[in-house]
């Protein structure tokens, strides 16, 4: 079935036509791997829920940003990349770096324990944020 071309795709085509590369918007999440291992041993569903909470919160907090709006207009083309941080310290250091570099994100804290579990960035063109995330591998 043929569908109309969405605004995000049109923006990408305009950029490509003007000599710029098309912007592929990606929402990156960085999830603590140690939560799946002893002494925590959280079930997979609980860890996945943390990533879902963080992603939803980041989208909501930055809902008025043009990248977020474009990302949400193309529901069937959403791209998310889930990376792993080995521990809480690494996750907090990343949050500090993102804050210093003015990269929009949400550090999700599990309540009532106040445990930092996941960072979700708002949707970004991957080339704008890859330098901050390149040391993290895909979550397994």
Swiss-Prot record:
InterPro entries: Pep_tRNA_hydro_II_dom_sf, PTH2, PTRHD1. It holds the Pfam family PTH2. It comes from the Eukaryota. Its EC number is 3.1.1.29. It catalyses: an N-acyl-L-alpha-aminoacyl-tRNA + H2O = an N-acyl-L-amino acid + a tRNA + H(+). Keywords: Hydrolase. GO terms for molecular function: peptidyl-tRNA hydrolase activity. SUPFAM superfamilies: Peptidyl-tRNA hydrolase II. As a putative peptidyl-tRNA hydrolase, it might be involved in releasing tRNAs from the ribosome during protein synthesis. Some evidence, however, suggests that it lacks peptidyl-tRNA hydrolase activity. Belongs to the PTH2 family. PTRHD1 subfamily. This is Putative peptidyl-tRNA hydrolase PTRHD1.
């Amino acid at each position: 079935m043929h569908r109309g071309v969405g605004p995000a795709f049109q923006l990408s085509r305009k950029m490509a036509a003007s000599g710029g590369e098309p912007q592929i918007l990606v929402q990156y999440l960085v999830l603590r791997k140690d939560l799946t291992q002893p002494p925590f041993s959280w079930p997979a569903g609980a860890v996945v829920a943390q990533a879902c909470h963080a992603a939803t919160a980041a989208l909501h907090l930055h809902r008025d940003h043009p990248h977020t709006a474009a990302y949400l207009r193309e529901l069937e083309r959403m791209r998310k990349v889930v990376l792993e941080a080995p521990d809480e310290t690494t996750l907090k250091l990343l949050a500090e770096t993102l804050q210093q570099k003015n990269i929009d994100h949400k550090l999700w804290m599990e309540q009532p324990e106040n445990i930092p579990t996941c960072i979700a960035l708002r949707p970004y063109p991957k080339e704008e944020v890859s330098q901050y995330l390149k040391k993290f591998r895909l979550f397994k």
